[in-house]
A protein has these predicted regions:
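Bacterial N-terminal signal peptides
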Residues: 8-17
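Cyclophilin-like peptidyl-prolyl cis-trans isomerases
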Residues: 20-265
Length: 265
């Protein structure tokens, strides 16, 4: 009798096992799918609205230090990038110390750039070759793919060195020229840099010097006074590319209050 009862229980267990297994499978699959949909909708919906404002506010509120470069050809206002803090802070330090006052734009090449910041240029004789003066230290390269050598870019000069470290004081402002699609393709192949459609359009329509990208640190740009850069780039130069007539500079930090006052004039 016991044997018959055991056999009957075994048969019943075999018959019920698939049904129990099916119920176990159905419940976890069914419930999580239903419960997952509602939270996802709420999480996606609300943060999307909330996060949109802070992102816009952050961009709108980002402040840049600006410097006015006064020359006998006119004034140039440059904006220093926050993405290159070491170059920015060093430049601000030198401006506040009046390091650049009375120095020359000592190297000028039309459709390329205008260069200055050699401390020896303050007392140099006419016709003397310049460009070797410095402050005794370099700044580590700060490359960022979003910062490139478009027309008006403010960049750090440097000597040949494997780290591509920048001069502590010498800089150049890009004048450049319009770059063709073919030239950009060649630069991409040679350097491995990939240019977005926006960058390509900038180089083709406004110009620049793309062959210097990711080789020299770009740490600012001309905000106003590009016509002054063009004027300096067009002056007669000697065999050293030094302007025949000295073009001296004087720099000062533009405070936010001064900027607002100037905009009202």
């Amino acid at each position: 009798m016991n044997r018959i009862f055991k056999i009957a229980c075994l048969i019943l267990a075999i018959f019920l096992a698939p049904q129990l297994q099916a119920q176990v499978k159905k419940q976890p699959v069914k419930k999580p799918l239903i419960s997952a949909k509602k939270p996802i909708k709420k999480v996606v919906k609300k943060p999307a609205v909330k996060s949109a404002k802070p992102v816009t506010d952050t961009v709108a509120k980002e402040e840049f230090t600006k410097v006015k470069i006064s020359t006998n050809e006119g004034d140039i206002v440059i904006k220093l990038y926050n993405k290159t803090p070491q170059h920015r802070d060093n430049f601000i330090k030198l401006v506040k110390e009046h390091f650049y006052d009375s120095l020359l734009f000592h190297r000028v090449i039309s459709q390329f750039m205008i260069q200055g910041g050699d401390p020896k240029s303050k007392t140099s004789a006419a016709g003397e070759m310049l460009g070797m003066g410095d402050v005794g230290y370099t700044i580590p390269a700060e490359f960022d793919s979003s910062l490139y050598h478009k027309k008006g870019a403010l960049c750090a000069a440097r000597t040949e060195n494997p780290e591509k470290a920048s001069s502590g004081c010498q800089f150049y402002i890009v004048q450049g020229r319009n770059i063709s699609e073919g030239e950009l393709n060649n630069i991409e192949q040679q350097s491995g840099i990939k240019y977005s459609s926006a960058k390509r359009m900038t180089y083709k329509m406004k110009g620049g010097t793309p062959f210097l990208d990711m080789n020299y640190t770009v740490f600012g740009e001309v905000e106003s006074g590009m016509e002054v850069v063009n004027s300096i780039a067009a002056v007669p130069v000697d065999n050293f590319k030094r302007p025949i007539k000295d073009i001296r500079m004087r720099m000062e930090i533009i405070l936010p209050t001064e900027e607002k006052t100037d905009s009202k004039k």
